[in-house]
Amino acid sequence: MGYGWRPQVRVCVPVPMYHCFGSVLGGMSMAVHGITLVFPCSGYSSRANLEAIQSEKCNFVYGTPTMFADMLSQDLHKYDLSSVEAGIMGGSPCPPAIMRKLITDMNMKEITICYGTTENSPITFMGFPQDTEELKTNTVGCIMSHTEAKVVDPNNGEIVPLGASGELMIRGSCVMHGYWDDPEKTRQAICQARWYRTGDVASLNSLGYCCIEGRIKDMIIRGGENIYPAEIEQFLYTHPKVQEVQVVGVKDERLGEQVCACIRLMEGQTSSAEEIKAFCKGQISHFKMPHYVIFVDSYPLTASGKIKKNLLKEAMEKKLGL
């Protein structure tokens, strides 16, 4: 990705600077290519993004699929987007409908899909601008130069055949040295041979394209933001009426997933979704607040007494009609 090797390129950067998407792909590209970065506003506003593109004549636009969907929901005919040439997208899979609208409605002749984590920053897989729509919507591109990737059986660590699913592992200079002051967590994430365990379920095809299929752990991906259910669960446990709580991600057309809190109340207690949401407001990040609050009597359990979150997720989606 050389931005046409033109230092006069201007990039609209609405993605947060506390993620590698903004801090590394933004700052590094500015340092290496001499491009101009345009920050639409101090927070996030799809309208401010479009105003910045128009006033600053931006050529490239960064964003997650959700950010692009928000921009597409505005009255685009009010803005001059003729300067736009391309988009860089990451954070979560992009629905085909959004991809097509970006090309037709926002003048993005080229759209590049990227994948990476903060631990192997900034990206390890990247698509080609001229990839087919199928490759752009179903894969995250090919492995970057000087980086290795493999998909292994998480149970035994053996490499699985092409096309088969397993845990994606990454090795290269992009992999972090470790988590600050947390050697145990570092050992869990990076093996002795310096392979980083992404925790993602993925597959590689014969052309080297990677398809991300889900999370091994229970992480929720809401609009490109990674949310750990345990963090929300721990907070909700502090509510005096809550006996037990499990948080799962349920399907959402715009954000990919939404946070659903499944709560078992203390005996004799009553509550409401509004009460739980009010309890969360101002105490946890807005994007981590439960969108749905469902009160349950029990949870699906394994023979050993562990909660089957996959079955709980399915039950909640069915109950909510998703």
Residue ranges: model-predicted function:
Residues 138-144, 159, 190-193:
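Short Gly/Pro-enriched turn/cap motifs at secondary-structure boundaries
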Residues 314-322:
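Acidic/polar alpha-helix N-cap and adjacent early helical turns
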Residues 66-68, 94, 175:
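Alpha-helix capping/helix-boundary segments
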Residues 7-8, 84, 192, 290:
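Phosphate-coordination loops involved in phosphoryl transfer and adenosine-cofactor binding
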Residues 8, 35, 50, 58-63, ...:
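Gly/Ser/Thr-rich phosphate-binding loop
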Residues 150, 162-176, 195, 201-202:
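AMP-binding/adenylate-forming core of the ANL superfamily
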Residues 61-64, 172, 177-181, 185-188, ...:
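AMP-binding/adenylate-forming catalytic core of the ANL superfamily
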Residues 1-10, 18-60, 74:
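Conserved AMP-binding/adenylation subdomain of ANL enzymes
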